Design a protein with these regions (language model features):
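Peripheral interaction segments used for macromolecular assembly
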Residues: 1-78
Length: 78
């Protein structure tokens, strides 16, 4: 499992298909990432992605889900 400490602000998040999902704003606790609201796909809202969706981290955060699935299932900030 990926450690939350491996994820840093401003890292690009990509789906399993290599398509851009968003940009990390910061880790929210130890189990979810908060994405920036200024990203082109964010619609002006922060979105949360569970750490459980992360496959691995290198210079990007790679998800186990495709970008389309991640965006369909991410949680908007209240």
């Amino acid at each position: 499992m990926v450690q939350a400490i491996a994820i840093a602000p401003h890292m690009e998040v990509v789906g399993s298909d290599g398509v851009h999902v968003g940009t990390v704003d910061h880790m929210d606790g130890s189990d979810q990432m908060k994405l920036t609201k200024t990203d082109k796909d964010a619609g002006g809202e922060h979105h949360f992605i569970p750490l459980a969706w992360v496959d691995h981290v290198d210079q990007h955060v790679h998800l186990k889900k495709s970008a389309q699935d991640a965006k369909a299932q991410w949680k908007a900030a209240a």
